From Swiss-Prot:
Single biological process term from Gene Ontology: ribulose bisphosphate carboxylase complex assembly
One of the record's GO cellular component terms: chloroplast stroma
Coiled coil is among the record's keywords: yes
Transit peptide residues according to the UniProt entry: 1-61
Domain notes: Has 3 domains, the N-terminal alpha-helical domain, an extended flexible linker and the C-terminal beta-sheet domain. The N-terminal alpha-helical domain stabilizes RbcL dimers and RbcL dimer-dimer interactions, facilitating RbcL(8) formation. The C-terminal beta-sheet domain probably dimerizes Raf1. The 2 C-terminal beta-sheet domains are swapped and pack against each other to form the dimer interface.
Positions of the UniProt region annotated as C-terminal beta sheet: 288-434
Main location: plastid
Protein name in the entry: Rubisco accumulation factor 1.2, chloroplastic
Region (N-terminal alpha-helix): 75-264
Sequence similarity: Belongs to the RAF family.
Compartments where located: Plastid, Chloroplast
Binding partners and assembly: Homodimer.
Organism of derivation: Arabidopsis thaliana
Function: Required for assembly or stability of RuBisCO. Acts at a postchaperonin step to fold and/or assemble the large subunit (rbcL) into RuBisCO. RAF1 brackets an rbcL dimer (rbcL(2)), leading to rbcL(8)-RAF1(4) complex formation. In the next step, RBCS displaces RAF1, thus resulting in holoenzyme formation.
Amino acid sequence: MFSLKSLISSPFTQSTTHGLFTNPITRPVNPLPRTVSFTVTASMIPKRSSANMIPKNPPARQQLYQPFRPPSSPIPTQFRSLDSAGKIEILAGRMALWFEYAPLISSLYTDGFTPPTIEELTGISSIEQNRLIVGAQVRDSILQSIHEPELISAFDTGGAELLYEIRLLSTTQRVAAATFIIDRNIDSKGAQDLARAIKDYPNRRGDVGWLDFDYNLPGDCLSFLYYRQSRENKNPSDQRTSMLLQALGVAESEKAKNRLNTELYGDKEAEKEKEKKKKEEEVKAIRIPVVRLKFGEVAEATSVVVLPVCKAEEGEKKILEAPMEIIAGGDFKVVEAEKGWKRWVVLPSWNPVAAIGKGGVAVSFRDDRKVLPWDGKEEPLLVVADRVRNVVEADDGYYLVVAENGLKLEKGSDLKAREVKESLGMVVLVVRPPREDDDDWQTSHQNWD
């Protein structure tokens, strides 16, 4: 046991001369010395940890900094012992592959030779010297990042120009670009465009079509470059089409190809919709009345018209041979034709038919889908034509003309565009056969009068 004594004087003891009140119980004027006793045990003494103790035999200190080791020389082993004259001899005779003698140029620079001097001694221009040095460096970076000797060996002959063009790309981009160059057999101009396209692609965010091309595919980057250039030309134009075809030729992703095909050939669905609308507009502009004959309509008609009938597949000859004039005379209105004919049809005297006079003829078609310019109903038709009005005059009128397999109807504007001046006759009426399940007997709401 340890005993500690200390005299403790109170800092609060104050003199009575200052006029301050002093408590005689808690603050004695002259305090007596006070003895403080306590016991220090072994548990209170901190133990020294072995972890904090210095070992008797400390381990050897590790070397934190490795000594400087200069990079290996880029000069091939067989050329390292050459002097300047030997290096110049190798360069002048091109006595190795281009990437093997390219480091000799840098070595000569170190020896004090200037590019013009080397050009004079070796015949390698200053521009070519730079291309060889940079191309060799690009080749080394690709060689260190891949394990495909077939790819890098493809640049053994004449590869300096191609590799020089992709010098500004990252190592990963260089590998992808080099692979694309070999696969597509791209020349130096194409390699230059490829490198420029890869570097420029991120800056084109927001441009038309940007999202349809894949930045990770070098072919898509080059394709997008050509696509942007195509938009600088008029649409349509040969220059624009040529650039789009060039872009389609190098595109890799399906999304990019679809975009370019749409630009070249249009959207198929949009084209179908456009064609449908065009056909609807043509139907609205047609000035031919189309009627469906009703059962018993001829019998109930107060007046009728009799017309000779020709089959469409019989062609032009039968149309010309058909009787031109049919006369009904006498008290009983006996019909008399100028010559005999096999087939006749009786129709109500509708205004378009009654206005024909002479020269009328009815041509029978087996399938309306091959005749009408709109969707047919797969049924036969009778087309009434006026052979007297055979001159093509009305742009919006329809005329009976000769086709490959017989006869057909064609619009006047189309005939004029082909400089066709005459036809077999102008169409005045199209008649559908009677049918019980069709109450809409008049399919065209034209005012015949």
